[in-house]
Amino acid sequence: VTLDDLGAWIIKCNPRKTPLESMRAAGEARSSWCIADNYRSRLIRPGQRVLFWVTSHPRRGIWGAGRVTGDVTVEGGRLHVPVRIPLLAEPVTAAELLTVGALRAMEVFRSPQQANPSWVSEKEWTLLEPLLPATGMAAG
């Protein structure tokens, strides 16, 4: 991934390890997520789009859409990214996304074990964005 072809970051959440109940009650994902210390973490910038992908759930898929809210920080020896990700009223499920042929190549399908953050390309974002409810994320 490069800044030129980045459509949005994806933060994945496994509800077997990170409970969803408090996030659902609050209507948004938690505000900080652990990410891998690699070249991707150095590409993250405030204002970039970020999607919230829930794994290991009968309705796995995109549960929220928002923005990176600040610079990556070190907390407890690990990198964290600050975000604001309002949850969608209903998730856009993996099954729904797979009906769009070109979205089958999304990294979350090709490499589901990839550490946070995953990403979608600008081309994938163009196909994905109309499937999301109005989120105010259209502009870069």
Feature annotation, model-predicted:
Residues 61-125:
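Aromatic- and Lys/Arg-enriched surface recognition patch
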Residues 1-46, 120-140:
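Compositionally biased, charged N-terminal/linker segments
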Residues 46-48, 64:
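Short beta-strand or tight-loop elements
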Residues 54-59:
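Short, charged beta-turn/beta-strand-edge "cap" motif at the junction between a beta-strand
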